[in-house]
Amino acid sequence: MRTLSAAFVCLALLARQADAAEARHLTLTLPRALGPGETAFANVELGLLARGLEIEVTTAAGRELGVISPHGIRAGQEAGTYALPIPPDAIVKGRVALRLSVNQFGHTRAPTAKEVKSVRVKITPAVR
């Protein structure tokens, strides 16, 4: 029984290490609390990306916020900044935990600092 328990612990640790190798985990703090009708966005600034590369952004719990799949970018140009809405229920105590991963031809890995240059939270005003 102890051997079986030890095996499960080892598998759990390996799975956690594999997830860390396949994604970048970030916890971002909102600049202030959301007001009525306001929306928080994750602004993802991308650098140089290889052709066919996609950036998947989810909450730490696995809820998909979006997939960034730039097309038509010339070789040597940065991919730009993309805004993904953050659901209000994903914000806990003024923070949001995100997971970013790169998908390319069926393989998943963590993005490099050159691929994802920054991720910031921006609050947009309510639409009137």
Put a short name on every predicted segment.
Residues 19-128:
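Beta-strand-rich recognition domains
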